[in-house]
Design a protein with these regions (language model features):
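Histidine- and aromatic-rich ligand-binding microenvironments
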Residues: 4-5, 34, 91-92, 114-115, ...
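Active-site neighborhoods of divalent-metal-dependent phosphate/nucleic-acid chemistry enzymes
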Residues: 69-111
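Short, well-structured N-terminal submotif of metal-dependent ribonuclease cores
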Residues: 1-34, 49-62
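Amphipathic alpha-helical segments within well-ordered protein domains
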Residues: 43-47, 62-65, 82, 99
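Hydrophobic side chains within alpha-helical segments
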Residues: 8-10, 14, 44, 98, ...
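Acidic, PIN/NYN-like endoribonuclease modules and their adjacent C-terminal/linker elements
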Residues: 1, 99-126
């Protein structure tokens, strides 16, 4: 199976370049794997460059999770992180994903200096 990077994800979500969006769709047509690093990078690009809201990011993540041609790395952790992200708007998606991946791997508590993240079960202020 093929894999895709951050730029392909951004084109699939924003469709700001019709030619690149079409190329991205054609590339993933037979299935593509999405690394969590590409997913978190894409969410950063959408927030920082495209100024998308947290609600927009949540919709984009859900779309990717449900996309018929995409397989997200550790999709269970991504889905759990999405739920947490939606319920804790002060905590970024990347932090939610880090916590859920640590939880799944059995490596808790997650040490953090982030005050918002530290309020969530499974974390510990360092």
């Amino acid at each position: 199976m093929r894999a895709i990077d951050t730029n392909v994800l951004v084109r699939l979500i924003t469709r700001d370049s019709p030619n690149q969006a079409a190329s991205a769709e054609a590339f993933i047509e037979k299935g593509a794997w999405v690394p969590v690093l590409a997913l978190t990078e894409a969410m950063w690009v959408l927030a920082a460059v495209y100024e998308r809201s947290d609600a927009d990011l949540a919709v984009a993540i859900e779309m990717l999770l449900n996309h018929k041609d995409l397989i997200l790395q550790d999709s269970e952790a991504v889905a759990a992180a999405l739920d947490l992200f939606r319920s804790r708007p002060s905590v970024g998606f990347s932090d939610c994903l880090i916590l859920q991946m640590a939880r799944k791997a059995g490596h808790l508590p997650l040490g953090t200096f982030d005050r918002g993240l530290a309020k969530i079960e499974g974390t510990q202020t360092v």
